[in-house]
């Protein structure tokens, strides 16, 4: 055939293919128009976190036996445990316990391997501050339980989490 005719046929096939791809993209766009919005109005609406959410660590001072398992399993050796050996009872007495949440990666190893369950993860995720030194929590700050999102009447909670399709 003539080269001009074959180029014209290729041009026609490419035009049809391009129109099909544009149509497929347009159909996907139209299918998303029926869905609910994914974003929420953050300060006024909050999602209720899942049961296994890894938020700020809660620490119970009375349960801790200063075994330092949390320090050994932490990938960045983060918890600082100060203790004193009581010679009369031959046990360690915990003096100070602190975690710097500016460095913590929230892996949950300390909570998982703690033999006395004195560490637990909370649903608190709003840890932002203007000074990074405020992220270093001692045992008093770690012992405070966060206010539950459900109990706050000024915040509308969003219960329906988007389902992940696999």
UniProtKB/Swiss-Prot annotation:
Signal peptide positions (record): none
Keywords from the UniProt entry: 4Fe-4S, Chloroplast, Iron, Iron-sulfur, Membrane, Metal-binding, NAD, NADP, Plastid, Plastoquinone, Quinone, Repeat, Thylakoid, Translocase
Cofactor note: Binds 2 [4Fe-4S] clusters per subunit.
Known catalytic reactions: a plastoquinone + NADH + (n+1) H(+)(in) = a plastoquinol + NAD(+) + n H(+)(out); a plastoquinone + NADPH + (n+1) H(+)(in) = a plastoquinol + NADP(+) + n H(+)(out)
Positions bound to [4Fe-4S] cluster 2: 74, 104, 107, 110
Membrane topology summary: Peripheral membrane protein
GO CC entries: chloroplast thylakoid membrane
Entry binding sites for [4Fe-4S] cluster 1: 64, 67, 70, 114
SUPFAM superfamilies linked: 4Fe-4S ferredoxins
Main location class: plastid
Subunit details: NDH is composed of at least 16 different subunits, 5 of which are encoded in the nucleus.
HAMAP family: NDH1_NuoI
Function text: NDH shuttles electrons from NAD(P)H:plastoquinone, via FMN and iron-sulfur (Fe-S) centers, to quinones in the photosynthetic chain and possibly in a chloroplast respiratory chain. The immediate electron acceptor for the enzyme in this species is believed to be plastoquinone. Couples the redox reaction to proton translocation, and thus conserves the redox energy in a proton gradient.
Name of the protein this chain belongs to: NAD(P)H-quinone oxidoreductase subunit I, chloroplastic
Lineage: Eukaryota, Viridiplantae, Streptophyta, Embryophyta, Tracheophyta
Gene name in the database record: ndhI
